[in-house]
Regions:
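Positively charged, polar, low-complexity stretches
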Residues: 1-90
Length: 90
């Protein structure tokens, strides 16, 4: 199944609350990816824009918040909604 087919299946099989969860999961995953890429590029410590003093990269906070959202959905067992090659994941 393609990603689009999985989303279509989720929309058809789940009420609106589940659709909102799927959308939030996808958004959180995208935020986590972007934050991780920024941290890899600029490091965990960066310069303050006005003072130049070293500070923790603000994307660390974004990455942590997104990961917490992803973990929350793992507790809700949304992994059973996603399939690879038409097979349900255990």
């Amino acid at each position: 199944m393609t990603h689009a087919q999985i989303i279509a299946s989720l929309i058809a099989d789940n009420p609106r609350a589940k659709l909102a969860e799927v959308n939030l999961y996808a958004e959180s995953f995208q935020q986590w990816q972007e934050a991780t890429a920024n941290i890899r590029e600029h490091g965990a410590i960066c310069a303050h824009p006005r003072t130049g003093q070293p500070i923790p990269n603000p994307y660390l906070t974004v990455q942590t918040a997104a990961l917490k959202n992803l973990q929350r959905f793992a507790r809700l067992r949304t992994d059973s909604l996603w399939r690879l090659d038409g097979e349900a994941q255990p």
